[in-house]
């Protein structure tokens, strides 16, 4: 997958050639099963039309600019989102910088600048409830109104239902709700994978060693979505170049919360991972923590 960081025709041609594109647009936070269903349709339609498949997304969640006080926590960081998008087989992702100026752009201008001028759009595939542009004024009908005079088609898709039969469509909001309740399995059912967090091990207070359970204090970006406080069964991969262990994955017990034994009044959740069968020093190493099951809530011991 090519990553394009400028919404210009020159940048797009350099990445995927002078060809037309079938496009989908969105925040794509989590790259969940609903997103993957849309991208599969984009790829299929692009192949049928002899075009390239492209995801148009943003360098930050639009809500973090438009309404920062209520912006959702993210299911994926920027790097993980690109990795997951690449795994769908899409030809390219255009990452549009999102700032106050972008937030104020009229939907018609966005379509002309990004889709028509930069991407030479041949088709647009989005959810039937898709909105975009200034004050979310753009929608499927606006795309259809513009399509006739600009030679592209619009194919709206319905929401993807959950595989477990629950009457709730797959969405980033539903996944965040599941995580907030500690239901990492329900989140995984909608993500199509287990939820994960990445971070660097900080110094912590090392008091866990005094009670026989040395833990790694993983510093996770504050913008990311943490599951509910509690203890989880997890798998932890050491991503950094620690000798003899880089790339190795361990079973782990992960505690999310205020560490009630030592920090009853902590102001924010902390992530501590105890890697089974690992006794080395993890300080300053980058870890990937994958949540498999909720074990119990926090309790002081």
Language-model regions, residue ranges each:
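Short, glycine-rich nucleotide/cofactor-binding loops
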Residues: 24-36
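Positively charged, low-complexity intrinsically disordered leader regions
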Residues: 1-21
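Phosphate/ribose-recognition catalytic cores of enzymes acting on nucleotide-derived substrates
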Residues: 150, 204-301
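Residue-level signal for inorganic ion chemistry
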Residues: 32, 85, 124, 187, ...
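General small-molecule cofactor/ligand-binding pocket signal
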Residues: 2-4, 93-96, 153-157
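Conserved beta-strand elements of the Class I
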Residues: 21-23, 54
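Classical nucleotidyltransferase
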Residues: 101-214
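Core alpha/beta nucleotide-donor-binding catalytic domains of modification enzymes
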Residues: 36-119, 126
